[in-house]
Each structure stands twice: as structure tokens, then as C-alpha cells.
């Protein structure tokens, strides 16, 4: 089966002041040490907001745009940290992520909705592989990037755990996802992750 991807991922490309081309935001762009350490949730939320604002004419008001580039994205990142503010344990579930995301939208005068899937390895509550596939396929086909919380890597050699990233594409049969994380992209085997991640995680999509 063909890869399912958001239609214009290049809208999430930013050139930093030193000339580095990044895909999606990077928490290192924050100014303070605490923000740099803990800001993955607000960055993932910023990716969702930015993409919606730049692909839907009626959602332009979700963020202020001067030149549509790095500086504008930084303004959004800083604002988002005030709505999705990490505590000592970070933003460790969708319940700490979604309310701030929607509150930000309301403050901008736009009513948005969120769909989310908590992934826990507990009997009777753990989503199956098909649940995750269906969730990702549904929202990527609707041209919505998906925020992904990885609480533990399982057998995958991912750069970080207890960490929010953004899913841009999925190959549904192999369950290989294309992920934006700290300005770079890589692939991750979501099927392997679901089967081996001890702490699970969450998926969140923002939509009208």
C-alpha cells in the first residue's frame, strides 16, 4: 500500500539563522534551559497548529504570520508553552496536552476539536495495532499531522523517550511512520513500538 502523508510537508520546513534547514520545530530554539529541556510537547502542538493555519484559509488566524518562516514559528512556540506548560514530569499523557491545545485555539477565536488515542499496555485497555493504524490513516488522509507521545522506546532505537514528536506520514502495511523530531525526520516502526513499548504513549490530531 502507498504511503499516506500530509499533502504539503514542506510547509513545516524552516531555515534557522545559521542556514540549517529543519522539518518541524526544535525545542532548542527556546531561550531558557528549562524550556529547552521540557518543551517537546509545546513544539509538537506548534507543528499541528502551524500546519492547520497554513493549509486552511479559514484557519489563518491560528497564528500570526509576517514572513511565514522561522521567526513566526518561534513566536508560536513561545505562545504555546504558556498553554501546554510542562511540570516536573513533563506532558506525559494526552490529558495534559489536549486542553491547552484547544484553549490556545479558543483564545485565537477559533473553535477546534481534537481526537486522541491513549496507548497503554494494560489488559482490556490497550489499543490494538489496527486501532493505531486506523487512527493514523484517518487523520493523515484528512491532511492532519499527528502528535505522538513516546513514553518508552521498547525495542526501537529512537533518539528519545518520554518525548513528543510529530507524525507526517505512514506506510499502513509495514506501519513505518515518518517522524519530525527536533528539526529532523526519521522513520519508526510503529508496529514494533506498540508491541514492545513498556509505557506506551498517545496520539493526538487537531481538526475542525
For the regions a language model picked out, list residue spans one by one:
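Active-site-adjacent structural segments surrounding the nucleophilic cysteine of cysteine proteases
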Residues: 1-97
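Conserved active-site-adjacent core of cysteine acyl-enzyme catalytic domains
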Residues: 2-13, 72-208
